[in-house]
Amino acid sequence: MMIEGLEKMLAKGVDNALLRFGLGKGYLDAGDAERAAEHLQRCVEQDPKYSAGWKLLGKARQAAGDLAGARQAWEQGLATAATHGDKQAEKEMTVFLRKLDRART
């Protein structure tokens, strides 16, 4: 239901980082990681300082099997979070990256 309303807003020409984040989260929660990643990519293109967008983009890419893409998103998000003092997002993405590293060995 939430996705439907957000898609209607997008179709009417409303497009911003928060809307794209909502769509990305909705699609990820619904199990459509690839579509989620598309919206989250647009989210961080529109607001590169949005560390939560980078964090969720990494999760969506990971869920879609794109581990290199997940790493890239989390590394970018980590730099963004550190620059803007978003300590919680910084901690979470550091943990996600460590888990990716452990999975490779």
From Swiss-Prot:
TPR repeat start and end residues: 17-50, 52-84
SMART domains (UniProt xref): TPR (SM00028)
Protein name, entry field: TPR repeat-containing protein PA0015
Pfam annotation, one family: TPR_19
Keyword Repeat appears in the UniProt entry: yes
InterPro entries: TPR-like_helical_dom_sf, TPR_rpt
Entry keyword Repeat: yes
Swiss-Prot/TrEMBL keywords: Repeat, TPR repeat
